A protein has these predicted regions:
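Short glycine- and Lys/Arg-enriched binding-loop motifs that mark or flank ligand-binding interfaces
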Residues: 41, 80, 117, 195, ...
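Conserved histidine-centered catalytic loops in small-molecule metabolism enzymes
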Residues: 9, 239-241
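Conserved beta-sheet core of the metallophosphoesterase superfamily
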Residues: 101-104, 122, 128-134, 175-239
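Core catalytic region of metal-dependent phosphoesterases/phosphodiesterases
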Residues: 2-3, 7, 12-111, 222
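Conserved catalytic scaffold of divalent metal-dependent phosphoesterases
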Residues: 87-191
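Active-site-proximal beta-strand elements of phosphoester/diester hydrolases
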Residues: 3-11, 115-122, 213-218
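A generic membrane alpha-helix/interface feature
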Residues: 27, 63-64, 94, 117, ...
């Protein structure tokens, strides 16, 4: 029985070039290290700091990462991609070209007999009022169609600016306050889920009650944390020793 890995908030493309190169190398090395033990990998939002697909165009700067994801697919590793608040403009590239199943919002299912609920977590906090309005605006289908009319050399820089604005707004919130997330998870526990996994807060965190567990995956900007499930236990792990 192989392992299931859960990763969120890598935000590839956010840092200055030299720092970004080191972080990409770290992330790729991590993916190579787990390829012999992983049955499946869930990317729970914000793998990229920005992602947008036109009909014939994708951002070229992430080629090295995309190549590694293709390698994982070729090795038979099952992969799933949930959108975050920076990479929700997912088209069909990941599914058709890389064999990565994508989802519009959340994922619910069973792994080794346990019921999981996965969601990036953006918009849950009561303080996220402004973001919830922005989220509806950015995801409105007509706005997406209008945006695709822009040439990529104009549209992509503009979208990166919007992505940066979203990050600045999120950074102003109290990131270590998990009360709203715990309350959300408790409702899912009542629905019968054993594990609730989210990201977005950039703080690794675990809450347990009555044999059920809520986990926030942290990030790959400061914590380099991820979740791993071995069929018996769900735990937080770190790519770098703390």
């Amino acid at each position: 029985m192989g392992l299931t890995f859960f990763i969120s908030d890598v935000h590839l493309g956010e840092l200055p070039p030299k720092k970004e190169k080191k972080r990409v190398e770290l992330f790729v090395n991590f993916l190579r290290e787990i390829e012999n033990s992983a049955d499946r990998i869930f990317f729970v939002g914000d793998l990229f700091d920005f992602w947008f697909e036109y009909k014939y165009v994708i951002p070229k700067k992430h080629f090295y990462i995309l190549l590694q994801l293709s390698r994982l697919h070729d090795r038979g590793i099952e992969m799933h991609y949930l959108p975050g608040n920076h990479d929700f403009w997912l088209g069909d590239f990941f599914d058709h070209e890389l064999g990565i199943k994508t989802y519009p919002e959340d994922w619910q299912g069973e792994i080794d007999g346990k019921k999981f609920y996965l969601f990036h977590g953006d918009g849950i906090a009561r303080k996220d009022v402004g973001y919830r309005f922005l989220r509806r605006l950015l995801r409105f289908p007509l706005n997406l169609r209008l945006f695709r009319w822009l040439h990529p050399d104009i549209g992509i820089p503009f979208a990166r600016f919007v992505s940066g604005s979203s990050r600045q707004y999120t950074n102003q919130l109290k990131l270590n306050d998990h009360k709203d997330y715990i309350a959300f998870a408790q409702k899912k526990f009542e629905e019968g889920y054993d594990y609730v996994i989210m990201g977005h807060r950039h703080r690794p965190f675990v809450h347990e009650e009555n044999g059920r567990k809520y986990m926030n995956l942290g990030d790959w900007l400061e914590n380099f944390s991820y979740g791993v499930f071995d069929g018996q236990e769900l735990r937080i792990a770190y790519a770098l020793k703390k």
